[in-house]
């Protein structure tokens, strides 16, 4: 089990934990749960011994564990249902994504436009949807240049036709980022309420060399 001390110190000063730190605490609580379950099964067969005190003090904090796991799917993935606001933002993002892609696919499917492209694909540059345009055809696709290939033969252009949609999508990305920060703040505050028990669990697991 990884040490929770650094995370607990950060919680003490009111800092927010990252998704990775919260998942690390979940791993600790999962280990505590296994030890607790083991102690219950052993209790019926073995008389009290020096480990009984450890087993009594350990607490897996299942509601906290469940809430963190409900909201955080992986270190870089927060669940849509972590909050109703996040669910709404992501629904809007999917709709906006579909609209942008539909418009850009219409451009790609136009034989004239396609002849100006290095590849008939939609790419992302700096969070903006772009088309890979042949450098010599730059004037044929009005838009904003966001990048170019190492050889300079391809320009990644955001067509003017989707600039406004891309702006709206970018705003949604920022809203998503803000909401994820709020979710992590809330989970961190919740976790801070149990800092003492988490520290106890870690100490016991370390003593047991778990």
Kindly give the residue locations of the regions a language model identified.
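Intracellular alpha-helical coupling/juxtamembrane segments of multi-pass membrane proteins
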Residues: 89, 93-96, 176-183, 187-208
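Conserved amphipathic alpha-helical "coupling/scaffold" segments
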Residues: 1-85, 89, 194-197, 201-210
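Coiled-coil heptad-register positions
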Residues: 40-43, 47, 104, 108-111, ...
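SMC-family hinge/dimerization module
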Residues: 121, 125-156, 166
């Amino acid at each position: 089990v990884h040490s929770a001390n650094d995370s607990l110190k950060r919680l003490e000063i009111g800092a927010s934990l990252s998704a990775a730190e919260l998942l690390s605490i979940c791993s600790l609580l999962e280990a505590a749960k296994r030890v607790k379950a083991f102690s219950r099964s052993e209790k019926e067969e073995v008389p009290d011994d020096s480990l009984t005190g450890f087993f009594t003090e350990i607490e897996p904090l299942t509601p906290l564990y469940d809430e963190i796991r409900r909201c955080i799917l992986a270190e870089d993935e927060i669940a849509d249902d972590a909050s109703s606001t996040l669910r709404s933002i992501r629904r809007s993002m999917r709709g906006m994504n579909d609209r942008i892609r539909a418009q850009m696919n219409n451009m790609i499917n136009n034989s004239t436009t396609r002849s100006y492209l290095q590849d008939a694909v939609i790419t992302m540059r700096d969070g903006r949807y772009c088309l890979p345009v042949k450098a010599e055809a730059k004037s044929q696709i009005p838009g904003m240049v966001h990048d170019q290939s190492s050889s300079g033969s391809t320009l990644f252009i955001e067509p003017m036709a989707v600039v406004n949609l891309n702006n709206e999508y970018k705003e949604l990305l920022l809203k998503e980022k803000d909401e994820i920060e709020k979710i992590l703040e809330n989970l961190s505050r919740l976790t801070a309420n149990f800092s003492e028990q988490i520290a106890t669990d870690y100490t016991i697991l370390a003593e047991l060399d778990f």
